[in-house]
Design a protein with these regions (language model features):
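Short substrate-entry loop that stabilizes the transition state in hydrolases
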Residues: 49-54, 60-104, 164
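C-terminal catalytic histidine-bearing segment of alpha/beta-hydrolase fold enzymes
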Residues: 104, 214, 218-274
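Primarily recognizes the serine-hydrolase "nucleophile elbow" in alpha/beta-hydrolase
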Residues: 118-121, 126-172
């Protein structure tokens, strides 16, 4: 079993409850969109029972990382979701989603749709929760806006909700989206969650820092404000002095909010997946 350890401590909430995740399984698959081999890591909860329904936690890595970030990294943003999945008996999935410079372009989106379809074929999957930080936090919001009926909840940490105004990592985003903002403006609009707030009816937790210069927080602050005005289940954790990271306590609070809200939400039929 993979140990789950909080930063600054030797005993975790998950360990105290006797919860663990199984060994990571590195899964290769052929992407239907282009025939290339892609990968994701899957970890089943301790005592996994294939005969009953399980929720899924899909975690999306940051820029420059890969599918192993949320499996091996000892930062709070990565350790907390592992513990959450173990504690709640969730299937834990960490995809490459087109590698270190994804930004949830069309191929990454198609891969994630395919992964969710595969999980639903292989297991009795109930609800799917997305989480990520930085590029992963952006990607989680983007995918939820594009496929709201496939996502039951979102934890977005230090991401952006507006890829039209975002001016960092433009070479990577251009390659992922198939062109610049001037060449394919519809891709940047379509993948900016701020422009699709009406689709975001699921529980969402957003963390952001006022001094984050890597992924400035203004767009997620605006998105959270709109969601609050629409009486959506949203929790914003904003630290004026915070930078491009989220501490352990705020990460725990964000996941607690979403997991609890998802558990209380009425069931809905899963979307058909292609």
């Amino acid at each position: 079993m993979l140990p789950l350890v909080w930063a600054g401590g030797t005993v975790t909430v998950a360990q105290a409850a006797g919860a663990t995740l199984g060994e990571p399984r590195d899964v290769a698959f052929t992407a239907t969109i282009d025939g290339t081999q892609q990968r994701y890591v899957e970890m089943l909860p301790d005592g996994f029972d294939p005969g009953r329904e399980h929720d899924v936690l899909i975690v999306l890595h940051g820029h420059g990382s890969d599918r192993w970030q949320y499996v091996r990294d000892r930062r709070a943003e990565c350790m907390v979701p592992r513990a959450v999945a173990a504690q709640h008996g969730m299937i834990y999935v960490s995809p490459d989603y087109r590698g270190p410079t994804s930004w949830m372009g069309p191929k990454a989106e198609a891969d994630l749709v395919q992964i969710i379809a595969t999980l639903r074929r292989e297991y009795r999957v109930d609800r799917v929760v997305l989480a990520g930080a930085s590029m992963g936090g952006t990607a989680a919001l983007t995918f939820a806006a594009l496929h709201p009926n496939m996502v039951a909840g979102v934890v977005s940490q230090n991401g952006t909700a507006n890829l039209v105004e975002f001016d960092k990592f433009q070479d990577a985003i251009t390659a992922s989206f198939g062109g610049t903002k001037q060449m394919v403006p519809q891709q940047y609009m379509q993948r900016s969650a701020e422009f699709h707030a009406d689709a975001l009816k699921m529980p969402i937790a957003i963390t952001a820092g006022g001094k984050d210069t890597v992924v400035p927080p203004q767009s997620v602050l605006r998105l959270a404000r709109v969601l609050e005005q629409q009486h959506r289940p949203v929790r914003l954790i904003f630290r004026e002095a915070g930078g491009h990271d989220t501490n352990e306590a705020d990460t725990v609070a964000a996941f607690d909010f979403v997991i609890e809200a998802v558990a209380q939400a009425p069931r809905k039929q899963p979307a058909a997946v292609r």
